[in-house]
């Protein structure tokens, strides 16, 4: 998702985007050989105050011959598009896609175009971006910035696809990552892109790939390239393109054979010091907001996975080659470690966000107002985070979902199946305590106000439920897919019920500050009052 401001190096100049739009995301791949469970995982934090917090099950369907599939716009790409009845919440009004996208009192979203429909489409889980389908195809996403072209508006003559709809078409039609990448590349070449530069992580039960794309200045086709993450390694992206050398005839890369010529024709082509055509340099893939907005998260995630790599926290510029595409973790990463990676605020480092003058009250790691603060992996504007797992030992593919920032929330497992009503049709502008997002929100807001005192209570509760849920998943491995999905829905109900009660327990701890000690990491100096 896109940032509101871009601070681009002096040679390019500073640009302030006028349009209100979404913030940013962090997304990772843990390959089979890098996972303690031997299971491929994809993670994605959906970081935007404007994000629709609903998670939707889209059922499998059969379609009559000659049917067309509508391709819809989305507000999360940049801003709302009233001319298309396209708004932030709900993200889509299209009852033909899923019951959860049926809002009879609202006007239907207007498509940008359409494509021939497949005879059969697979069931999948959907958010602002597609999550996972019934065959274990998994996606993650982050928006990137190209100083050449930061945004291409949707209009006649421009492409009809943004990454969100592109990923959904892949989930509807594909079983494997390679199949999905080739399909999405074909769609880009045929129908074109609009919006911003994007990364889509694409994985299946065996392997993970990174697909990066960028609209062209003409709105025809698009630049795109995909690279495989080697088995046994961990990958992270954080709002900046990560693929470097474009390597023809490399089986670990997939791209339009005309990509090198397209870059030259656009005047974008740039080579690295060895003379290789370089994707990051060709895209002029600068960071959003300010230096380290993206690179700090890349450094931290890679360093958490592989401390022995001793990667530098500081680099010379946005085009640094100090960080490898992926790393081999020092030890296989557990599910708990993957969850906690998305809770990280650089704790224990010289840039620990809980300490120093910029720290919030009660050592909060969050910053408000000016966007030039260090961007942590956890963030105050996270709407939800998912961790997908396609495990053959389970009855069906599953994912873990945390509403709001996971640092103040809990991950709950679900199958690729109909979800509880608590996860559908929530409105961020109207409090509704029957909805999971609002149940989480009341705990989140209270915790952030008294962070050092209350966050340990929340973290302990989250870890306990995550342990219980993991045991339940293992114990349910021999159930049918339908039984497994129901078991997880019932578990979600228990977690949400406890989370409602957790808010009351936190108020008891708070007790109007009487029993709360202020954290020494950020203790404001008192004014000296010694005389009248």
Task: Place the predicted regions along the sequence by residue.
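Sec/Tat signal peptide C-region and signal peptidase I cleavage site
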Residues: 18-24
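A contiguous strand-loop segment
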Residues: 25-162, 183-330
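Bacterial N-terminal signal peptides
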Residues: 8-18
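Bacterial N-terminal signal peptides that target proteins for export
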Residues: 1-8
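Histidine-centered catalytic/metal-binding microenvironments
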Residues: 459-532
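Second-shell loop/turn segments in exported
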Residues: 152-156, 166-174
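Accessory, solvent-exposed terminal regions and/or long lumenal/extracellular loops of proteins
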Residues: 294-371, 375-379, 461, 468, ...
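Substrate-recognition/cap regions that form aromatic- and gly/pro-loop-enriched pockets
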Residues: 354-481
